[in-house]
A protein has these predicted regions:
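Hydrophobic residues in well-ordered beta-strands that form the structural core
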Residues: 17, 120-122, 197
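Generic structural signal for small/hydrophobic residues in well-ordered secondary structure
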Residues: 10-13, 53, 120, 145, ...
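Asp-based, Mg2+/Mn2+-dependent phosphohydrolase catalytic module
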Residues: 1-4, 125-126, 130-214
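Surface-exposed amphipathic alpha-helices with a cationic face
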Residues: 96-103, 112, 165, 185, ...
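Substrate-recognition/cap helix-loop segment adjacent to the acidic, metal-dependent catalytic center
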Residues: 28-31, 92-102, 114-150
Length: 214
């Protein structure tokens, strides 16, 4: 069996709880109206354009011009962006801690610390990611990070996975990639990674135990 020496984490939905509902349930209490707003105006596809490098200002002004009656709610998307963060997904952060430092905590070593390189591959705006770096200490534990907004490309486009491989010298056949979006797992599998579709921290832990890395 090939020895696994690399694990690549997605961030949102795996290590960090992020959901626009946390903010917009306060701004738009009516569920039907809120769902319409988040699927018609500030949509996931629109947000991903910022993940791919478009400026927050340009994106916001474009929507305000198109939907002036919803200006307040549109501007809130990035003005109050931190209110979409639900905090760390603590059980997954604990798995990360064990892989990085060993089960007893920082400085203890352990199998993960001895042989696993740990990286992050995230769809995230280059303008908001520095805020997350200040908020979450564990984002500094990685051996390397690749942020889509800084690279002007994003998952699931194959080029961002190839960039990850080239930049950090990763051998995909010896690597694991974990993401809560199966759309983003499939390209990693095609390039040779063991792709894990993240559902819960407990299932993730069980899969890592089965692969012999925990």
């Amino acid at each position: 069996m090939t020895t696994i020496n690399t694990l690549v984490f997605d961030l949102g939905g795996v290590l960090i709880d992020w959901n626009p509902e946390y903010l917009y349930s306060k701004l738009i209490p009516d569920e039907k109206e809120r769902k319409w707003f988040l699927t018609t105006i500030c949509t996931p596809d629109w947000n991903e354009q910022q993940d791919e490098g478009r400026s927050l200002k340009e994106a916001t002004e474009h929507l305000v011009g198109k939907y002036p009656d919803h200006e307040r709610s549109i501007r809130a998307y990035y003005d109050r962006w931190t209110e979409m963060l639900g905090g760390p997904i603590h059980e997954t952060v604990e798995i990360f801690r064990e892989l990085k430092f060993g089960p007893a905590g920082k400085g203890s070593g352990g199998p993960g610390a001895a042989r696993l390189k740990l990286y992050a591959l995230t769809n995230w705006s280059a303008e908001t990611f520095p805020v997350a770096l200040e908020m979450y200490e564990f984002l500094h534990w990685f051996d390397g990070r690749l942020v889509s907004g800084e690279e002007k490309t994003r998952k699931p486009f194959p080029e961002i996975y190839r960039l990850l491989i080239e930049r950090f010298g990763i051998e995909p056949a010896k690597g694991i990639y974990v993401d809560d979006n199966i759309r983003n797992v499939l390209p990693a599998r095609e390039l040779g990674f063991i792709g894990i579709h993240f559902r819960t921290p407990q299932l993730f832990r069980e899969e890592l135990v089965g692969l012999g890395v925990l």
